[in-house]
């Protein structure tokens, strides 16, 4: 065999070996490229998982005390009584001013101060209706939620200006406390003020299809608020009208995608009753116990609360659930309503949107190790083949000599 042929053959062997090594390295690189996109995700709302619930729906009813509603002490809310007996009720009361166990009170008279307190932790001196709009410089629960990466939306039946800062419910801000806060007066936040269509008749089938549609959406908000109109909330139609409305609407809520597939809770509460109220800053001499009921898959069943609560307790419950700081001393000192939930998980104060960790994904290390082993095996086999071919060449050269 000529030296030229021998050199050409050896060159081909070296070229094949280098090519195989490059191929192995390319294989490892491709595997790494496949692993990283498959296991690295975009921003994740770290605050979405709550201590007791991940999603909250709130419905505000109007102007009736505990015993106006509960049939156990003379009320006429048969559906609301059944719902409370199935899931939970805050307290066992014998009158609107007396409970043998627990109880939930309003914080103001008339309505608007209660609505402001529910989202702001105080009525800020507004002890009558008619205050609107954007005048309060204080902060609300919305700002706390948004800073934690939590989402929200607030519906009002038959409002005009849906999704804009011209949003105007039938009772203006009297029954929609969000409108009193100046920080809400931005186009980004006003997008979350939404109108929903009320039933044509309070005793007919519930409509509210816009509101219900949001509960069946792929990504429901962490908190969804509903202010019914004055027929549906019992303000003008009395307990029987409001009870009929809820008897149609609540089953649709509890059978929604949100309540079937998420850790969701429904809170139904009246803004105020018909008597005095004693928790500060309310200036009554007697309690004003209200119907306040939690329901849904995360709520205890057939449970009667033993703690003493008011509207600030609702706010405290939201803050405790998602690790949010207090707005005022009122909610800071209130008791959270955690006793109503079947189980709780420890949650740290959420820190907003953060990327999920690549290395903590359980699929990452097995795939990387598999890729490395595959590459090593490929290199070993390639080297053995190259060594065998070199021996063949050397044998051929020896024989030629």
Regions of interest found by a model, annotated:
Residues 1-19:
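N-terminal secretory signal peptides that target proteins for export/translocation
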Residues 2, 32-34, 47, 366:
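Position-driven detector of the extreme protein N-terminus
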Residues 14-15, 37, 369, 373, ...:
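Residues marking helix boundaries in flexible regions
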Residues 42-350:
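N-terminal pro-sequences and low-complexity stem/linker regions of secreted or lumenal proteins
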